[in-house]
Amino acid sequence: MGNKESKYLEMCSEEAWLNIPNIFKCIFIRKLFYNKWLKYQEKKLKKSLKLLSFYHPKKDFVGIRDMLHMAPGGSYFITDNITEEFLMLVVKHPEDGSAEFTKLCLKGSCIVIDGYYYDTLHIFLSETPDIYKYPLIRYDR
């Protein structure tokens, strides 16, 4: 058995666990459960976001621009695969055709928009009257 394997087995043994002070055990267990809870909350959020109507563009900007040019006025969620890297809320104004982009970030069970944390998108939409008056509609090519 190699040196690394024996150290790992020694670390995982019950005797080694018993030698660790209780305060460190508590910190370790809390961190372990907290991380699992955060992952669960993030999964729950992603699941609820998938229930909304998303437009899944190609990864290039040209596809997004073409979609917005052809789309009627309204609000659109644009994402490639519902990740933190690329999740946006786009509002296209029906009068002049201009569009406003807001990048959304997932943080645990919250969505971070412009540095503010929101538990649900409904809270964000109700606090933002300019966006709320436009319907969240699905657009398919």
UniProtKB/Swiss-Prot annotation:
Superkingdom of the source species: Viruses
Protein name: Protein MGF 100-2L
Organism expressing this protein natively: African swine fever virus (strain Badajoz 1971 Vero-adapted)
Function: Plays a role in virus cell tropism, and may be required for efficient virus replication in macrophages.
Sorted UniProt keywords: Early protein
UniProt family annotation: Belongs to the asfivirus MGF 100 family.
Induction: Expressed in the early phase of the viral replicative cycle.
